[in-house]
Amino acid sequence: MSKLKSSESVRVVVRCRPMNGKEKAASYDKVVDVDVKLGQVSVKNPKGTSHEMPKTFTFDAVYDWNAKQFELYDETFRPLVDSVLQGFNGTIFAYGQTGTGKTYTMEGVRGDPEKRGVIPNSFDHIFTHISRSQNQQYLVRASYLEIYQEEIRDLLSKDQTKRLELKERPDTGVYVKDLSSFVTKSVKEIEHVMNVGNQNRSVGATNMNEHSSRSHAIFVITIECSEVGLDGENHIRVGKLNLVDLAGSERQAKTGAQGERLKEATKINLSLSALGNVISALVDGKSTHIPYRDSKLTRLLQDSLGGNAKTVMVANVGPASYNVEETLTTLRYANRAKNIKNKPRVNEDPKDALLREFQEEIARLKAQLEKRSIGRRKRREKRREGGGSGGGGEEEEEEGEEGEEDGDDKDDYWREQQEKLEIEKRAIVEDHSLVAEEKMRLLKEKEKKMEDLRREKDAAEMLGAKIKAMESKLLVGGKNIVDHTNEQQKILEQKRQEIAEQKRREREIQQQMESRDEETLELKETYTSLQQEVDIKTKKLKKLFSKLQAVKAEIHDLQEEHIKERQELEQTQNELTRELKLKHLIIENFIPLEEKNKIMNRSFFDDEEDHWKLHPITRLENQQMMKRPVSAVGYKRPLSQHARMSMMIRPEPRYRAENIMLLELDMPSRTTRDYEGPAISPKVQAALDAALQDEDEIQVDASSFESTASRKPKARPKSGRKSGSSSSSSGNPASQFYPQSRGLVPK
């Protein structure tokens, strides 16, 4: 019995979404039937015959498209979150094809209380439980990460390019190094943390989903609870809730993924395939090795699958005939996951509990503050003893001050001390019997006392503020809630849990009754005639034959699925082989053999991070490179101070490490002359000279033009300038009286 109690099966529920607009427009058939009472999902074969039996799967609970978000949470997830508040580890993850509503199940619709998913409902549940608790201190932390293309990113970090590493310790198991976590004190704060992470998450559009998650996201809530035990000491319980939103498996032919989307889909499918292999290996009793290290996702879910955690798996499916193959694959994996056994235990008094560190730091600061107040009391007692019996009034005043301070009225104490010093300063200033030097000395002493008092007050206030800030991060219940309302809410939640538990028991009883009906019928049946017996036996035979056919069809489908997976793996292997050959070809032709051997000798495979690394060039990893000596600054080799001084004073080369021969430069005589160009261009100068020359008067006889005016003008010659000039010189006698054209530009 103890063995049965220590182990617990993974709880698997199935949720079917409604038909979307695209599926209705394409006139796809609905092939998924959901029986909520029996917890069964039946899938029809759209290509099969009418006599073919549908494939039926039974789960812990099933929800159809009419199920509300709060029903799903109250019946399935609330008991798990209660276990986390008691100190267990818990995991909720949504599994299924892309576009089936995994993100809707986990996150829901922001701003709509009725459509809030598992994550926002768990926030309300956790902080409501804390507010109703008594004599308990809580510390709630939140972290958010994603696995994008097998790289872990911190969604709450400012530097989104930083990649985180997975580490493992014997006491805590697998954890993410340098993952940031934020202490949250209310639902509003933890929702803000989730919203910041969602803005950094990788999301893209495909043909099957407009807002497709391109990464696996894990929201981690760590709840630490401190409570005084029967032994009178504080005991700390730490519960961790992992809320996992997986990216959906997808086929490139349906999603139309290309380029970066295709790379993302390949990595998503590989990690989900590794998750399926882990589930199969855990269920199969013959497997001696569980392949957790095949992907980052399976390593992070190592405790949730077969480890120290309570796990609920939500399998999301679509009802359309278009996705029947993916629906069957999801249901088969979910059916296998039912048989995984976990061994959850309460995490009591862990060494790395942050709550204990907070409590120790608060106690240290309070002790420091108390020490300061004790010092002030001792100083007052000394002053009182020094005052003697004559200072009875002052003694009574100081006793009153001490009583006020003990009554936590510290502000009045500081104010009275300051007023007292001010009165003493005024008395010194008004005392004319004192010498000026003595008066200045006394005033300086009072100023110093006032400064010390102010400094002590600031230090005490700073310590008090630090204590308040740390105490504000620790949540204590039962302060701001009306007891009557609190009790009513508790009763209401208990009734809800009882109803959910009753539904679960009814479902289990009905499943057991159906399985035993056949056995009881065989035992109780009596036949009045041989014909009746033949008819009943024939009916049973037909029923068994249909079951046999269903099992054969299931085996055939599994074989086909196995063949497809093998073909996909072979294709992946061929692509990797081709890429490897290309790398080898580049190395052989472009990288020298010595460099290749150096890198090969330094390379090693890191099992922790699951990839190849290079050993450091130096033997010791932390050893730093030798620095240049300080005496060698500005020189090629170290020099002593004496050598430097000798170099500056004497010209001899004894102490010189460089520039031993100091030679002056031998400057050669100049053999060239600077070019001096003309002030004006030669062509321009010639034109100006020609234009400025004196010319004789020209007489023109225009009588010849009168005789030639009546003649026809000759056609213009085609040859241009030369022919024109020759014809004018030969045919026109008047042209000899005209001079040739002149100008700045020669023609």
Curated annotation (Swiss-Prot):
Say where the protein is mainly found: cytoplasm
* Sites bearing N-acetylserine, chain numbering: S2
Q: Tell me the segments the record calls region Globular.
A: 580-747
Where is it located? Cytoplasm, Cytoskeleton; Cell projection, Cilium; Cell projection, Dendritic spine
Q: InterPro entries from the entry?
A: Kinesin-like_fam, Kinesin_motor_CS, Kinesin_motor_dom, Kinesin_motor_dom_sf, P-loop_NTPase
Q: Where is this region: Disordered?
A: 374-412, 698-747
Query: Locate the Kinesin motor domain: which residues?
Result: 9-340
Q: Does the keyword Nucleotide-binding apply?
A: yes
Kindly indicate whether the keyword Protease belongs to this entry.
no
Q: Where is the composition biased (Polar residues)?
A: 701-710
One function term, GO molecular function aspect = intraciliary transport particle B binding
What does this chain do?
Microtubule-based molecular motor that transport intracellular cargos, such as vesicles, organelles and protein complexes. Uses ATP hydrolysis to generate force to bind and move along the microtubule. Plays a role in cilia formation. Involved in photoreceptor integrity and opsin trafficking in rod photoreceptors. Transports vesicles containing N-methyl-D-aspartate (NMDA) receptor subunit GRIN2A into neuronal dendrites.
Q: What is the protein's given name?
A: Kinesin-like protein KIF3B
Which species is this record about? Mus musculus
